[in-house]
Amino acid sequence: MKNRFYLITAVILLLPCTLRAQWSVGLLGGAGYNVHSQDLHYLTDHRLQGAAGLNFGLTGQYDVTDWFGLRMDATFTQKNYRQYRTDLKEMDYHYRNDYLLVPVLASFRFGGARLKGFANAGVYGGWWLSCSQQGSELNSFSGKTYEFSRKVDFNADKDNRLDLGLAGGLGMEYGISRHWAVQLEARGYYSLASQVKQYMRVQDYRYDTTVVLQAACLYRF
């Protein structure tokens, strides 16, 4: 008898949350800025500079209540950067790194019926899809500078293609109608996985911090 009472009580308590639960799916797109960090050791005239990149993909969210939901995205995100030398200005490298990122986030919403603010926080996993390089180099034999654009092949012993880290963002949402809504969000990705495996005696850790500004169009079921 007590078990039935507990079961009925649990159903009654969870019923309002179930009735309010709502699925939404959509498309998102925007642009980002990536900052690459690494220990340059004795390379005293080498410099690193952040660079802009694209960000677009799919999003899905399950709203448990009117103020809390679970969100997961799948995005194509670029983590680009520039490396150059101050003593040899001919040596200038621009790296384009394409990633597939899958953030899983807790989403907290607040505000009115149509215009709401939200905060997302969670973790992400990703995969380094491709890398390319363009810029200029100095030929030490001829003394001439030449420009190049080339694809960089991955080295299984050196490159760590698995990306893991923290993700979070702040944004606004406007409900156009019962089923449609648009969002604008500023989100940050902080990588906890080095791009380089520590296969040498000298440690070489390389990390990315990426901030994106993205807009999304959502359909609510």
Task: Set out the residue ranges of the language-model regions.
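Hydrophobic alpha-helical segments of small multi-pass membrane proteins
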Residues: 51, 123-125, 168
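Solvent-exposed, glycine/polar-rich loop segments of beta-barrel outer-membrane systems
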Residues: 136-154, 198-205
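Gram-negative (and chloroplast) outer-membrane scaffold detector with strong preference
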Residues: 23, 31-33, 37, 61-143, ...
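Short sequence motifs at beta-strands and strand-loop junctions characteristic
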Residues: 48-53, 94-99, 156-165, 205-209
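Short glycine/proline- and aromatic-enriched beta-strand/turn motifs that initiate or cap beta-hairpins
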Residues: 21-60, 159, 220
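Extracellular loop and loop/strand-boundary signature of outer-membrane beta-barrel proteins
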Residues: 41-46, 87-94, 153-158, 199-205
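Predominantly the C-terminal beta-signal and adjacent terminal strand-loop region
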Residues: 158, 163, 168, 174-221
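Bacterial Sec-dependent N-terminal signal peptides
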Residues: 1-28, 217-221
